[in-house]
Design a protein with these regions (language model features):
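Hydrophobic membrane-insertion alpha-helices, especially the h-region
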Residues: 1-15
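Catalytic-core regions of hydrolytic enzymes
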Residues: 22-40, 46-148
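Hydrophobic/aromatic residues positioned on beta-strands within the core alpha/beta folds
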Residues: 43-44, 186
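Peptidoglycan cell-wall recognition and remodeling modules
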Residues: 50-54, 92-93, 158, 162-164, ...
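Sec-exported extracytoplasmic/periplasmic mature domains
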Residues: 70-81, 109-113, 151-159, 203, ...
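Conserved beta-strand segments of alpha/beta enzyme cores
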Residues: 82, 161-164, 180
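Active-site-adjacent mobile loop/cap segments within catalytic or ligand-binding domains
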Residues: 111, 125, 167-220
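Active-site-adjacent substrate-binding region
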Residues: 143-165
Length: 220
């Protein structure tokens, strides 16, 4: 009887330790555990028939996302950081939006990077709103840390439009990824001036530089 009670206590203790580590039944809870090494997953949002947000003058989010993501990849690989892209062309990753998002999350979870960064563009009904915004999963300490670092770097581009990193618990990628992940909204396509910036190669270089610098600071 004593032996059974002792075994039960040991089992309960181990279960408690697993919960504290953010692991249950062999799976990390969303955004709770950092991956190993210096592998980064870059996720260029949307693609294919899913153009994402449309700019005031017709700019398509999917194209801007991919161009900026490829620039970030180039900067990171030049510094010896391994990068996996969820997409490197204009193709969608699934027949439906849900299937597409599931595949992106599957890649993140399978590769288990130290950080996954999903690149997007924003839009809002108020045409005057502009500036980059970084989101993280609300319950992820690692995600919060990464988001704050990236937000700080992006705020340097134009301090007038500085923002704070925001927690979110509803975005599919944020709540289903088992690794630290952030969503970077580089700017607002609903703002005419920012749309013009976001389609320019020079400004894309600037944004890519800020994001890659933030990633490197997070890794360090």
């Amino acid at each position: 009887m004593i032996g059974c009670l002792l075994a039960l206590l040991i089992i309960c203790y181990k279960a408690g330790e697993q919960l504290k580590a953010g692991i249950l039944n062999g799976r990390e809870t969303a955004g709770s555990v950092s991956g190993s090494g210096t592998l980064i997953v870059l996720d260029a949002g949307h693609g294919g028939i899913d153009v994402g947000k449309m700019g005031v003058n017709g700019a398509e989010e999917k194209e801007i996302n991919l161009k900026i993501s490829l620039k970030i990849k180039k900067l990171l690989t030049e510094d010896g950081i391994s990068v996996v892209m969820t997409r490197s062309d204009n193709d969608r990753l699934g027949d439906t939006q849900k299937a597409d998002l599931k595949e992106r999350v599957r890649i993140m979870n399978e590769k288990h990077p130290v950080l996954a960064v999903s690149i997007h563009q924003n839009s809002y009904e108020g045409a005057e709103v502009r500036g980059p915004q970084v989101f993280y999963y609300t319950d992820s300490d690692a995600g919060r840390s990464a988001a704050r670092i990236l937000q700080e770097e992006l705020n340097r581009i134009d301090p007038v439009y500085s923002r704070e990193a925001k927690g979110n618990s509803s975005y599919y990628i944020l709540k289903n990824a088992e690794v630290p992940v952030v969503i970077v909204e580089c700017g607002f396509l609903s703002n005419v001036e920012e749309e013009e910036l976001l389609i320019s190669d020079e400004y894309q270089d600037t944004v890519a530089g800020a994001v890659s610098e933030g990633i490197k600071k997070y890794i360090d």
